[in-house]
Amino acid sequence: MAGLLKKIFESGKKDVKYLERKADEIIALADETAALSDEALREKTVEFKERVQKGETLDDLLVEAFAVAREGAKRALGLYPFKVQLMGGIVLHEGNIAEMKTGEGKTLTATLPVYLNALSGEGVHVVTVNEYLAHRDAEEMGVLYNFLGLSVGLNLNALSSTEKREAYACDITYSTNNELGFDYLRDNMVVYKEEMVQRPLAFAVIDEVDSILVDEARTPLIISGEAEKSTILYVRANTFVRTLTEEEDYTVDIKTKSVQLTEDGMTKGENYFDVENLFDLENTVILHHIAQALKANYTMSLDVDYVVQDDEVLIVDQFTGRIMKGRRFSEGLHQALEAKEGVTIQNESKTMATITFQNYFRMYKKLAGMTGTAKTEEEEFRDIYNMRVIEIPTNKVIIRDDRPDLIFTTIEAKFNAVVEDIADRHAKGQPVLVGTVAIETSELISSKLKRKGIKHDVLNAKQHEREADIIKNAGERGAVTIATNMAGRGTDIKLGEGTIDAGGLAVIGTERHESRRIDNQLRGRSGRQGDPGVTQFYLSMEDELMRRFGSDNMKSMMERFGMAEDAIQSKMVSRAVESAQRRVEGNNFDSRKQVLQYDDVLRQQREVIYKQRYEVINAENSLREIIEQMIQRTVNFIVSSNASSHEPEEAWNLQGIIDYVDANLLPEGTITLEDLQNRTSEDIQNLILDKIKAAYDEKETLLPPEEFNEFEKVVLLRVVDTKWVDHIDAMDHLRDGIHLRAYGQIDPLREYQSEGFEMFEAMVSSIDEDVARYIMKAEIRQNLEREQVAKGEAINPAEGKPEAKRQPVRKDQHIGRNDPCPCGSGKKYKNCHGKEA
């Protein structure tokens, strides 16, 4: 252990030596840079950009660029970065975490690597925890960047897409972590590439990096859509399919558990739902509900595939026969079963897109962060983000007095002592900051101070604007400020007049947080830039952390010695508290790591889908090649399921292939039984694909190329988006129920990975099948609008247009059942005058 500590200590010393050497090189250019005029200094930015274009790396430019940014800060802001700030800037440029104590000027430090990395033209994101800080830093530091000829954008929640696009197009963009994540998700839901706002993710500097990458790591960002407004369509589809007759209206393929409507079944469906063509894009929802109702009624059996318990449909594992609690069938099949069994149909709000901060920030080419407290989480930063934590020495020696903890037996005794201490210090004119773990604690102390008539401010992490003002004044003479631990981060407490003589800022902690890092943040509020200060934590044996880690013995010992109201100050207790904190931190790290392992499954799937969407949206020419691959995979699956080359021909189900092709890919009768007989499985596939190719060629002639391309995009985007949202929903249910599988020797994570993969494979096949069906069967209308995909609107001519004048129908005309009726109604012949014929 001693050897390990020595190694860590020595590597830290090595880091500091290297950083000091590099910082000295920058300082050596100070006179030369100071001699440049404002114009010449600005010209340096243009020169650097050209050098990057010609192949010089940012590392090559570091010393010169930092010297220019440093001189620029002096002229534009009146601030001249210290040597330690140059060192911090180098750490950030190298994609690591600079641990710099409160008051050491992290905001100014960040300007150096931000300036350097902005020269690449790829865009730099500066990330803060709230909009107030983003706004403040963009405004204050923007003066420097503009002075040096760089553009600065501020990305806020209230901005329109156009304004966001402009903000992201700037050299440097300030934003909150939430807004960045949501913009990424929204970009992957757009239907035109022009609607995307972000550029590829290049470099981000995260302020208060521990807060964003550790404390908020487990919080997923979720964009939810409304669930289907009504469950009535499931009930209607269920009622309809129960009126159908097997063979006449639908066919069942036992092997693949698929059900197809026949031509008669389709006609009945069109009449029942009062639509012209079930395969029109506007009717995808109806067709989907019918398909699921058919599957639920004619391929799924009660007490075999599922059971009904307590008004719920529960899935039965086909291999073990166990009930799989928490799992739901995807794509609406579960709701179709609920309609079939007459139980309550559950419709939750749908998750349309989701990502965690862990996975969002790991997509950047380079990531850096700064904070006053990261050393305690060093292992996590290294394992998960591949970032090292490097401690930067302070500019001036810290002279703050950190006192050992005071421990009381009861909470009441502790709070009384806290209030007495505040009153004494307040009387001397010493500013006091009281840190609490919970809001109710801050309110309790506030009421005790009111009774004593001590004027004070209470700060909860609710109002960012007001928060900064209160914190700014917290260092004034006699000020008393009560704050929950995280409140006011990012704003310095500067000491007012006459407070140094009173002892500087006194920080009083009312209990230990379960994380040492949060305690250290509170301590670090005092003693900034070599100022005097004092910190004191008050604990009681009834505090949650003490209760969790066995303080009963000590409590009874203190009571035995008659110390119920007195405090003890013991290094042993402080060490016990710290080891308890270490245990909690370890548990929390394990839990965040586990979240990441689960989320990685969805991350890999998300990347595949988002990449496919991006290719579709950006495609300039026809998507036929992609679509033909989907059709080929679908035909391959259907043929191999019904006519496998590994089975004797007498076991083949050629009629099943014809039923599927008639229902989904080609006009009825295009392929007959005679066409398929005496052929190999491969020949059958090729025959079907040749016929489909000819039908596709014919379809392409119906519209100009750019309009047909738009039709292909509409189909692909609608199918991919619908299936992906259903899949996320199914993965959510799988994740919720997977821990229930931890029976026997089953590892829930392994199960989640393998089942998640199977579900993804099934979704991809389902996308192939639906795209093939809609491309081949949908009637192409003119003026297709991709926007209608996003809104799920009808892809029909606008309603409300005057009805076309109907033409008389002559009996001697030969008209196909699916041809448009010549009367001009716009309906199919079979649904109009064909009925009379």
From Swiss-Prot:
EC number(s) on file: 7.4.2.8
Q: Which residues bind ATP?
A: 85, 103-107, 492
Q: Spell out the SMART domains in the cross-references.
A: SecA_DEAD, SecA_PP_bind
Q: Which cofactor does this sequence's record say it needs?
A: Zn(2+)
Return the Basic and acidic residues bias intervals: 800-817
Major subcellular location class? membrane
Protein's UniProt keywords contain Nucleotide-binding: yes
Question: What are the alphabetically sorted keywords of the record?
Answer: ATP-binding, Cell membrane, Cytoplasm, Membrane, Metal-binding, Nucleotide-binding, Protein transport, Translocase, Translocation, Transport, Zinc
Q: Which residues bind Zn(2+)?
A: 821, 823, 832-833
Kindly state what the record says about how the cofactor is bound: May bind 1 zinc ion per subunit.
- Location of the region described as Disordered in the Swiss-Prot/TrEMBL record: 791-837
Q: What class of enzyme is it?
A: translocase
What PROSITE patterns does the annotation carry? SECA (PS01312), SECA_MOTOR_DEAD (PS51196)
Picking any one GO molecular function of the record gives: ATP binding
Q: From its record, what is one biological process in GO terms?
A: protein targeting
Provide ranges: composition bias, Basic residues. Answer: 827-837
A GO cellular component annotation in the UniProt record: plasma membrane
Q: Which reaction does it catalyse?
A: ATP + H2O + cellular proteinSide 1 = ADP + phosphate + cellular proteinSide 2
Q: Which Pfam families match?
A: P-loop_SecA, SEC-C, SecA_DEAD, SecA_PP_bind, SecA_SW
How is this protein situated with respect to the membrane? Peripheral membrane protein
Q: What does this protein do?
A: Part of the Sec protein translocase complex. Interacts with the SecYEG preprotein conducting channel. Has a central role in coupling the hydrolysis of ATP to the transfer of proteins into and across the cell membrane, serving as an ATP-driven molecular motor driving the stepwise translocation of polypeptide chains across the membrane.
Assembly: Monomer and homodimer. Part of the essential Sec protein translocation apparatus which comprises SecA, SecYEG and auxiliary proteins SecDF. Other proteins may also be involved.
Similarity comment text for this entry: Belongs to the SecA family.
List the protein's name.
Protein translocase subunit SecA 1
